Amino acid sequence: MATRRQPLIPGWLIPGVSAATLVVAVALAAFLALWWNAPQGNWVAIWQDSYLWHVVRFSFWQAFLSALLSVVPAIFLARALYRRRFPGRLALLRLCAMTLILPVLVAVFGILSVYGRQGWLASLCQSLGLEWTFSPYGLQGILLAHVFFNLPMASRLLLQALENIPGEQRQLAAQLGMRGWHFFRFIEWPWLRRQIPPVAALIFMLCFASFATVLSLGGGPQATTIELAIYQALSYDYDPARAAMLALIQMVCCLGLVLLSQRLSKAIAPGTTLLQGWRDPDDRLHSRICDTVLIVLALLLLLPPLLAVIVDGLNRQLPEVLAQPVLWQALWTSLRIALAAGVLCVVLTMMLLWSSRELRARQKMLAGQAMEMSGMLILAMPGIVLATGFFLLLNNTIGLPQSADGIVIFTNALMAIPYALKVLENPMRDITARYSMLCQSLGIEGWSRLKVVELRALKRPLAQALAFACVLSIGDFGVVALFGNDDFRTLPFYLYQQIGSYRSQDGAVTALILLLLCFLLFTVIEKLPGRNVKTD
């Protein structure tokens, strides 16, 4: 009897292999472009360059301080947010989630409006007869901006760890009269300590690869990171060899940080509980006072820069700026790039997870992890490094394109894949556990399964992943900083041009439009599935 010929590659493996091959090939091409353009001279002299080591040391130092100042206060803020219920709590938690994807230049504009020499606090001190000596430039300004972005995110992640503590443990501790330090040590700390290392590693990596923040607030050669040095080598000195060497150093450092982050990221077993909603509010007076102070301080950190963007944007230049065709051209370019990059990111992420979950279901755990790791690999090549590789590759072959749309869209899509993976990974696994046997028994597979099962059950996670990818892309400045020009502007690039030419009032209007566009785009996309959508 004739046997049916088996395909060389199973159909369920093709999507993941295709996406992983594309991502790895792009990363490899960028790496080779950097390697070929790296200086071939005396490497000993390069490694003895004192300024190079100053840049490397400063990159690590500011990332370490940023992670420390973000994670330690987040522990106490997360406990306060868990214990207290107050009007606006859900809005505050939503704001904590939004700071990660807030355009960097918008936040920087707000921070300068509040903490700058002519800012709100300086005016307040002047009216009180005090001298305002804080400068938002240099290391202190970089740390302030990084804490603004990352402390809310760390608080949100640590709050999730506290919410995973079984209600029975909390109830038993309350019955035993366990309070204060003992409750934190024996009940909360075992759950927090498993979440703190991966959160700290993630924040360290994000701050180490920070570009727009350091570019705006660095304040000179003493506060320069590797990414900023790459940008300076290409944009000001046009020294591709030095840029390639710096990009290689950045890539090696980030790859080590990615591997460390993956090593520290251990899944927290949720366990089973019958009292998931039970909590002990700890209504002692000093506890309520401490929690209130922490929450108020968090609000004072988050709200003033955002309010400053809104207030400063509503100035007398508003009608004139809105009448400029350049603004609407930049807005349309940003929207076009963001939507295209978001869709491409979600498609590539679904392809990776589709095959990786099938590998896991067949007990091929190592292969499944390797496929997912290919999506995280792009974290080892920050946007400025990837863009540098593309810049050198195109410049040495076919020449730089007239329009950078394709490069920016593709790069932004790749940079958003790790975030989309985190959003879709667990829902995809849950669907496999719930519907895999049923689909096999009914013979539903491939496109039919995608249409009947995944696209229906994943409406909310898909919308959330698309929203994150689009807003991350619309606020990106690292990639467009290399390819942007007068004929190709995004809103962040246009805002940077306005700030650089000291058109602060025009820049305030642009920052307000960019802020409103991000919040509107995120909200609209996240609401696409509908309020009453069912995922069962």
Language-model-derived ranges and their functions:
Residues 163-192, 359, 437-458:
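Short helix-to-coil transition segments within interhelical loops
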Residues 171, 179-183, 268-282, 317-318, ...:
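Juxtamembrane inter-helical linkers in multi-pass membrane proteins
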Residues 113, 212-238, 476-504:
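Glycine-rich helix-loop "coupling/hinge" segments at transmembrane-helix boundaries
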Residues 34-45, 116-128, 218-227, 268-275, ...:
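Peri-membrane helix termini and adjoining interfacial loops of integral membrane proteins
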Residues 7-41, 50-163, 191-216, 245-262, ...:
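Membrane-water interface segments at the C-terminal ends of transmembrane alpha-helices
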Residues 45, 90-93, 126, 167-175, ...:
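Short amphipathic alpha-helical coupling elements at transmembrane boundaries
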